[in-house]
Amino acid sequence: AALKDLTDTARIALLPGSGWPQQTGVAELEQMAPLTGSFVELGDEGCVVWSRTGKKLNSIQSGYARPALAAGKTRFVLYNRSGNELRVESRTQNLYTKQLENSIFLCAISDNGTLAVVTEDQTSMAKLLVYSPSMEQQLSWSMTSNDGTPLRMAFSPDSRKLAAAAVTVSGGQVMTNLYLINLASGDPVSLVNQGGVPQWLGWTSASTIL
């Protein structure tokens, strides 16, 4: 899959396109994310990948009731927020399709293709799963009501750490717990606990979270 990503990058850079503006085929745009040499658009009926020169690279009709996507550099994950299926896509083709045991809340994907998934959990508040770029499970964390449910996630630029902002209720107040997970060790570290709901979470450098 890594070789395929490199091949795609070289091929996309050389592909002629029709240029812009043009119709992309997405009637009602819900999300858009940049990829290397291209971008992906999500509409209510599926998503489309276009090169920066205006060449259509991929088109996916998922049939998901509540589709959402998260993107890295060369891959993106398309998932169903009303179901338990996700698809990991390169810019030109499907790499993996996975059915999880429980409904999906949220996904994030790193620049190297590491995937984080938050699902419902029968015995706790939520479960955080992390998969390698080859879809081998690296981490599983059953999160209690005190831990909260992740509402925002972001991988570090080097893809070695995952920040997660999890929302919980304490004393009638909505609180956010910010965790940092080193993927090599798998141990979550609580960084801060504060009131309110996070609107955005990201890395401004290799070591700074905003």
Per-region residue spans from a language model:
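A short beta-strand motif characteristic of beta-propeller blades
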Residues: 10-24, 53-61, 92-99, 137-143, ...
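Asp-box/WD-like beta-propeller blade repeats and closely related beta-sheet repeat scaffolds
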Residues: 95-115, 119, 126-127, 134-152
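Extracytoplasmic/luminal low-complexity segments enriched in Pro/Gly and acidic/polar residues
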Residues: 161, 166-210
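Structured, soluble extracytoplasmic/luminal domains of envelope-associated proteins
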Residues: 49-105, 110
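Short beta-strand elements that form the blades of beta-propeller/WD-repeat-like
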Residues: 30-43, 47-48, 68-81, 86-87, ...
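Repeated scaffold domains used in trafficking and secretory/extracellular systems
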Residues: 25-32, 62-74, 102-111, 147-154, ...
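Gram-positive cell-envelope targeting signals
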Residues: 1-19, 30, 76
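Beta-propeller blade-edge and WD-like acidic-aromatic loop motif
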Residues: 46-51, 84-94, 125-139, 172-190
